[in-house]
């Protein structure tokens, strides 16, 4: 299951968990973001040991800016509040490989 984050404090509390957190930074107007969304949802079901969240960069621009997001979609992997990997672009194979490698 993918949870859409609603504010900065929620984002920080989730990414500080002692497990893999996969963040999808997206925009509603972004075609590639829409194209990969079903795969991201599928990964959340397949890799249930990780937490999957989405951040709308237009609604939560301060989170995106603080994280260093420059293009959408961007997928950041966190553990214990530290960003451990970054995938830019709608590349499901690369995203899945990164999830597997960091679980």
Swiss-Prot record:
InterPro entries with a match to the protein in the record: Thioredoxin (IPR005746), Thioredoxin-like_sf (IPR036249), Thioredoxin_CS (IPR017937), Thioredoxin_domain (IPR013766)
A GO term from the CC aspect: cytoplasm
Residues the UniProt record annotates as site (Contributes to redox potential value): 31-32
BP GO annotations: cell redox homeostasis; cellular detoxification of hydrogen peroxide; cellular response to reactive oxygen species; hydrogen peroxide catabolic process; L-methionine salvage from methionine sulphoxide; sulfate assimilation, phosphoadenylyl sulfate reduction by phosphoadenylyl-sulfate reductase (thioredoxin)
Pfam family, one: Thioredoxin
GO molecular function list: antioxidant activity; protein-disulfide reductase activity
Active site: 30, 33
Keywords tagged on the record: Disulfide bond, Electron transport, Redox-active center, Transport
Gene3D superfamilies listed in its UniProt record: Glutaredoxin (3.40.30.10)
Record-marked site positions (Deprotonates C-terminal active site Cys): 24
Residue ranges occupied by any Thioredoxin domain in the UniProt entry: 2-103
Paired cysteines (S-S): 30-33
Entry function: Participates in various redox reactions through the reversible oxidation of its active center dithiol to a disulfide and catalyzes dithiol-disulfide exchange reactions.
Family: Belongs to the thioredoxin family.
Protein's recorded name: Thioredoxin-1
Organism of this sequence: Schizosaccharomyces pombe (strain 972 / ATCC 24843)
